[in-house]
Amino acid sequence: MVLKVKMGDIGVAKSPESIETLLGSCVAIILYDRGKKVGGVAHVMLPKSRNAAEKNPGKYADTALPELLDRMTKLGARKDKLTAKLAGGAAMFKCNSNTIDVGKKNIEASKEEVRKVGLRIASEDLGGDIGRTITLSLKDGSVIVRKGAELKTI
């Protein structure tokens, strides 16, 4: 079964399921506990929330990661056993010098939040100007990244 994560949402599951999301300028924060075969994906739309009581914590990098960790530990994952991966953050629109590159800001914020909680980023597929679809296999923690006709594993 494939759990589809929508924009600004968080999905967690156990093996044998997989988790999938479609990304443009958004960034997927992907966590996996190999021992428990528990994984999760946060589909981050923006770098920072305006308040701590945000109704949709998956939308922002600063609120998505704590919520993702909480949901995964409830399924049996251990923070000290987690592997982190990142994908997305494409520059989907041509920007002039006065325009904020949301993809770049999402990448920076997501990396910072992962570092803040003491996790190491094992692999990533970030930036560029093409959207991508990612699929996290909860059997082994592999992440398939599809960009157009290109397919790779991170």
Swiss-Prot record:
InterPro entries: CheD-like_sf (IPR038592), Chemorcpt_Glu_NH3ase_CheD (IPR005659), Cytotoxic_necrot_fac-like_cat (IPR011324). It catalyses: L-glutaminyl-[protein] + H2O = L-glutamyl-[protein] + NH4(+). GO terms for biological process: chemotaxis. It is an enzyme of class 3 (hydrolase). CDD domains: CheD (cd16352). Keywords: Chemotaxis, Hydrolase. Its EC number is 3.5.1.44. Pfam families: CheD (PF03975). GO terms for molecular function: protein-glutamine glutaminase activity. Probably deamidates glutamine residues to glutamate on methyl-accepting chemotaxis receptors (MCPs), playing an important role in chemotaxis. Belongs to the CheD family. This is Probable chemoreceptor glutamine deamidase CheD. It comes from Methanococcus maripaludis (strain C6 / ATCC BAA-1332). The lineage of its organism: Archaea, Methanobacteriati, Methanobacteriota, Methanomada group, Methanococci. The gene is cheD.
